C-alpha cells in the first residue's frame, strides 16, 4: 500500500506524486473523501489517476492511497435482476445506504449483498480431485437461472470439506487442499479484474443463430450465438429500440444490458418494461435473466470506460457456467468519447478526430472477448457471448473513426437509415447497405435443422428488393407506366416484402416478436404469390387482372403479422388460397 499526494487535478484526471511503489491499473483512494480511481499512467514517481467519481473540491496536497488491487468485479449469486453502475456499485442499495437519489462521493457499498442467504446444493464429494472451472454445486438464483459455483482460476487440488445448506456469499462453503499442501477456503463469490479476459479451454466457430424475433434481422442479417454485431445510426433511427427488442426476445440464457453514456430515460424504460414482459422461451419475467449496468450521460465520464469492461467480465462469468449470454452496449460511441477525453487530458498524440491512436485496439479488445468457447473445468460444456454494440456517429456519418474501427471487427452490420425512419419504416435497417457474414452458415444450419430451403428463399427475397432499387430510378424519371408487366410485378412483390414482412411494430403485443416458424410461413406466402403471379403473366394474364383478382388474399397476407403464434395454421393455408385465386384468374381471363 503506497501513499502519495495530489499535485494536479484536471477534471476526472488526478496526478499524484510519491507513488513510485504503485503499479499501472492499481485502484486508489483519492483525497480526504476516498474517491475511487485507477492508475492509467506512471512517470517516475508520478501517477496519472482516472477518477470514477466527481472530482470537484479535490485539491493539491490531499492524500492518495493505493489498494494494490486492479479494478475488479464481484462474481457470485445476486447479480441477476440487479442494476449496477459502471464500477459495479449496486444502485438500489447505494440509495438505501446514503438516503440520496444521487451518487454520494466516497461511499463504499459491497457490490453483492452480504446479508442474503443462498441455498447451495453440492454436486461433488469430499476427497474428489478438482481443478479450475470444475462445478462444485449450484444455487437457484431465480426461477430461470441456476447459478453454478465453480473452482476459481488458479486453484486445483483435493476437496477436504464441502457442505450443502444456506450460506451468505462471504461464508466459507468448501475447502480445497492445493498441490503445494496449502489450503484454499472458498466462498460462493469470486473476484476478477475487469480488463483481463477470463481464460477458456478452446475457441470454437459460432454456428447456431441467435433468434431475436425481429424478421429483418433473423431473415436477412442474422447473428450467431457467439457473434458480434454493430448497430450504427443517426439520432432517432431506432438504435435503442433495436437493442431493447433483442434484449427482450433473444433465445439466450442471460442478457447483460450496458447503458453507457446514453439518456437516463432509456434505462427507466428498461426498468419499467422488462419486469412486465414474459420471456417466450421460459414463460418467466425477462428481468429474471437480466443484469443492468447503468452509466447514464449525467454520471462521471471516466466510469463509462469501466462500464463496458464490467459488463463483458460478467458475461464471461456466466459463459463459464455453460450459458449463452448476450451483451448489449448502448452506446460504444460514448465509451470512445470517454477514451478521447482521458487521452486529451494525458496530452497524448491524437489520432483521427481527436480519438486516441489506440482506439481500434481498445474496440477490438472488447469485441474479441465475445465468441463461442469450450470452457475450463468439468463437466465439459460450451458457452457463448454475443456482443451487440450500438454506435452513435455524429450526424449519422458512418465514415467516422468509431464506426469504421467497429466495422473492421464485427461480422454483422445493421445499418439504420434516417430516410427509412422518417418514412416510419421500423426497424429502420437498410437492407441494401447492411450485411451479415454469418448469413450462409446460418442458412445452412437452419436448412439442416428445420429441413427447409430457407437459404434460397432469403436469396430470392433479397433479389426482389435489389431489383426494386434499380427500377425505382426509372420510375422516378419516366413514371411507373413505362415498366413492363413483369417489372411492375417485381415492384409489387418487393413492396410486399418491405411492408408486410420487414416492417415490424415493436409496440404491438403480437407483432413485437415473430417465431421462426411464423417468419418462414409469412415469407413462403409472399414467394408463392410471386411464383403464381409470374406463371400467370407467362400464360398471358395482365398485371392489373392479377392485382384486382387477388385483393382479398393480399390483404390477408398483409395482416398475417398480427396473427398470434397459436393460430399459425391461418397463415399457412394462405398459400393454397393464392394458388386457387390465380387459377380462377387464368380460367376467366388471360389467353
From Swiss-Prot:
Taken from the record, one Pfam family name reads ATP-synt_ab_N
Q: One GO biological process from the UniProt record?
A: proton motive force-driven plasma membrane ATP synthesis
Record bears the keyword rRNA-binding = no
Q: Which PROSITE patterns match?
A: ATPASE_ALPHA_BETA
Task: Identify the SUPFAM superfamilies for this entry.
Answer: C-terminal domain of alpha and beta subunits of F1 ATP synthase, N-terminal domain of alpha and beta subunits of F1 ATP synthase, P-loop containing nucleoside triphosphate hydrolases
Binding, ATP = 233-240
How is this protein annotated for GO cellular component? proton-transporting ATP synthase complex
Give the keywords, sorted.
Answer: ATP synthesis, ATP-binding, Hydrogen ion transport, Ion transport, Nucleotide-binding, Translocase, Transport
- Protein name (record): V-type ATP synthase alpha chain
Source species: Streptococcus pneumoniae serotype 4 (strain ATCC BAA-334 / TIGR4)
